[in-house]
Amino acid sequence: PTIINGGVINSIQNTAKLGKSEWSILEADESDGSFVHIPPTYSIITNIDREHMDFYKSMDDLKNYFIQFIEKVPSFGKSFICIDDKINNDIVKKLKNQNFYTYGIHPNSNFLIKNIKHNKKFTEFDLMINLPNKKKEYIKKIKTPLLGIHNIRNSVAAVAVALTVGISIPEIKNGLLNFKGVQRRFNKIFSYNNIDFYDDYAHHPTEIKVVLEGVNKVYKGYDKVCIFQPHRISR
């Protein structure tokens, strides 16, 4: 597929790649509202936070942009919304178009994350799938080298889309297991004197909180130091 991403993808050492298939995968940028001009077939809404308020007039304005984006998805497509996020949960209730699935650790999720296990090398989880008018499905032992609950949620979003478009479970598991990640997304840079050094782009309070929660789960009992670089006065 053609790929356009906000960060450098480690496997291709670039933010973009021109593919040869009819598929395009891109990261939509909501910072200036331009994402509503993208015509998605499948969309993923990870979370919505009080950000980019230099452009949006209010939180209601921000929410309305996301509602507009979600409702642009055609009937032959689908939106995937993480309902662990409070604002996403509010938006779901306001959608006129019910053409979406939900995911997360929230018990009402269509793609429900179960049995999370953390270690330094991999995160493992199970996935219970409960879709309208379909038989329940349970996928065990999905592994990803990415750490933190936010990366599990992101992985599940990718799994949900992949299953919906007909990619097999073995292919999905293999793809996640071998995913090299994106630069500055909790990347391990090096180790020195038994100390591991990671780099992460998180600069919004919510993002920083989520990353640190992931670190605490993986490195229980270890001393941890966080060095924060302030970025933009609006954040």
Predicted regions and their residues:
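Loop/turn-to-beta-strand initiation segments
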Residues: P1, E22-W23
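Cofactor-binding loop segments of dinucleotide-utilizing enzymes, especially the Rossmann-like FAD-
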Residues: G6, C82, I105, F228-H231
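Conserved coil-to-alpha-helix start sites within the AMP-binding
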Residues: D29-I38
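Active-site beta-alpha connecting loops in nucleotide-dependent enzymes
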Residues: V182, T206-R235
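Phosphate-centric recognition/catalysis
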Residues: L26
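Loop/helix-junction capping segments adjacent to catalytic residues or to phosphate/diphosphate-binding pockets
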Residues: G33, N89, I152, P205-T206, ...
